[in-house]
């Protein structure tokens, strides 16, 4: 998997951006939807066209006024502004029925300053004159693409042009090695940690096909082990960046997490553990990625501050007791070297292999030590277990009445597997499957009474044959 190009849909409210989003993604299920404090005005979805793949962003509406007065900041929400800057391609959606109004012109002027490909979509052309889209030539952004997104008309033509220069997913060449993503809020020291991790190693820096302009893969070797560092902090090394662009970038973080084997989340010790840090940990866990936490700028704290942060870690990280937390100074290198053993253990845990026999034995040992509860007088039986996947590891347990197994007992089994196999830093998915009954939900289930009835019926038939179907000739007839 490579990091995909990003296409942002922008425009005034109610011009059809969400409808076009659904046409692109062919689903109403967004990759990320309404994450508190982060994506209030945006949702993200995966889109494909032929052998091309990209991420589409549906931004909030821009421009409530229609008099053309004021500058772009009067029209644009902060979240939409950020989405536009993190996109590779802009699709500017306008309303062909309403015609061009002042807000459209202001947005058009702003788009001219970005230096990014912009495609103007004149939506809602159904029921208007064929010449209506021509009005939007005045934006100076090229030919408007006529569309009726609600009916899917014109969507294919736009996708063909939009994806023309995107790389084929079949031809993307991935670098080899453990993929390591460094994520965190702005100014927590990600760039400093990246440089410290790379050290003086000879590295090859290159832009992979299909990556966003702000993310690069950096292959390097340390102690004979190949790594690929996914760097999303590169945008901050390109001179002065507008303050609004420096806001937390959800999409770059999500892409880095999805494409990684292990994610290192960097937290600023001076600011403490904030909700956004926990959101990012949640992203990594939801994606099933192995995780290591680095509390940066630790050496700048007083003894009292360090004690306070340790108490906060115990309180706020209590839902991830299996994740290793390191106190480091990326600037001075203190504790950075200790990250590597934790990264490797987390990766090995996420990819661990074990035989079905061994896994089933561990399951039976756990059940013997602490049997499952009874349901309606019958004890739940867990019969065998096997590996069902990696990164994250999946353990599949088969048995009867598994749907009635309490959450507390499921956690007990997960903890038993973690302890026995020493799994560190990775989520573990334990899946329960019900043994299939071929007679389930059928009216002819063979109960004991029915079986007896069937046997009696067969005996009756045999008796009828012996009494009614006697031979039609006698021994006397045989002699003839």
Curated annotation (Swiss-Prot):
Residues 352-436 form the KH-like domain. InterPro entries: G_ENGA, GTP-bd, GTPase_Der, KH_dom-like, KH_dom-like_a/b, P-loop_NTPase, Small_GTP-bd. GTP 2 binds at residues 184-191, 231-235, 296-299. Residues 455-480 have a biased composition (Basic and acidic residues). GTP 1 binds at residues 11-18, 58-62, 123-126. One of its GO terms (molecular function) is ribosome binding. Residues 438-480 are annotated as: Disordered. Belongs to the TRAFAC class TrmE-Era-EngA-EngB-Septin-like GTPase superfamily. EngA (Der) GTPase family. This is GTPase Der. It comes from Psychrobacter cryohalolentis (strain ATCC BAA-1226 / DSM 17306 / VKM B-2378 / K5).
């Amino acid at each position: 998997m490579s990091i995909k190009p990003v296409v942002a849909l922008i425009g005034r409210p109610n011009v059809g951006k969400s409808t076009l989003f659904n046409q692109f993604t062919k689903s109403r299920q967004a990759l990320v939807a309404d994450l508190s404090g982060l994506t209030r005005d945006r949702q993200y979805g995966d889109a494909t066209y032929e052998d091309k793949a990209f991420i589409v962003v549906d931004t909030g509406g821009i421009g409530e006024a229609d008099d053309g007065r004021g500058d772009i900041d009067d029209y644009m929400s902060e979240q939409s502004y950020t989405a536009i800057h993190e996109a590779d391609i802009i699709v500017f959606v306008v309303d062909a029925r309403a015609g061009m109004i002042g807000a459209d012109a202001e947005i058009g002027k702003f788009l001219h300053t970005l230096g990014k490909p912009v495609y103007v979509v004149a939506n809602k052309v159904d029921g208007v004159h064929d010449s209506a889209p021509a009005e939007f030539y005045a934006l100076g952004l090229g030919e408007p693409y006529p569309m009726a997104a609600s009916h899917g008309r014109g969507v294919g033509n736009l996708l063909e042009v939009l994806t023309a220069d995107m790389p084929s997913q079949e031809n993307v060449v991935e670098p080899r090695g453990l993929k390591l993503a460094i994520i965190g809020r702005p100014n927590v020291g990600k760039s400093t940690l990246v440089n410290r991790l790379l050290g003086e190693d000879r590295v090859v820096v290159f832009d992979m096909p299909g990556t966003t302009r702000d993310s690069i893969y950096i292959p390097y070797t340390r102690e004979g082990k190949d790594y690929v560092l996914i760097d999303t902090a590169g945008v901050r090394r390109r001179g002065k960046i507008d303050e609004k662009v420096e806001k937390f970038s959800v999409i770059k973080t999500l892409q880095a997490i999805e494409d990684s084997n292990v994610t290192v989340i960097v937290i600023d010790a001076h600011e403490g553990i904030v909700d956004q840090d926990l959101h990012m940990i949640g992203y990594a866990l939801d994606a099933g990625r192995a995780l290591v936490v680095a509390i940066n700028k630790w050496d700048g704290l007083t003894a009292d501050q360090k004690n306070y942060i340790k108490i906060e870690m115990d309180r706020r990280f209590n839902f991830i007791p299996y994740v290793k937390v390191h106190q480091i100074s990326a600037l001075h290198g203190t504790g950075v070297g200790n990250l590597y053993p934790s990264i490797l253990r987390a990766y090995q845990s996420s990819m661990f292999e074990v035989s079905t026999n061994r896994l089933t034995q561990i399951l039976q040992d756990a059940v013997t030590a602490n049997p499952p509860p009874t349901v309606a007088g019958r004890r739940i039986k867990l019969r065998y277990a096997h590996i069902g996947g990696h990164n994250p590891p999946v353990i599949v347990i088969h048995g009867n009445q598994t749907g009635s197994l309490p959450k507390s007992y499921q956690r007990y089994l997960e903890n038993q597997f973690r302890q026995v196999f020493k799994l560190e830093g990775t989520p573990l998915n334990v899946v329960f499957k019900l043994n299939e009954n071929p007679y389930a939900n059928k009216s002819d289930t063979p109960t004991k009474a029915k079986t007896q009835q069937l046997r009696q019926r067969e005996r009756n038939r045999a008796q009828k044959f012996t009494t009614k179907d006697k031979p039609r000739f006698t021994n006397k007839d045989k002699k003839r």
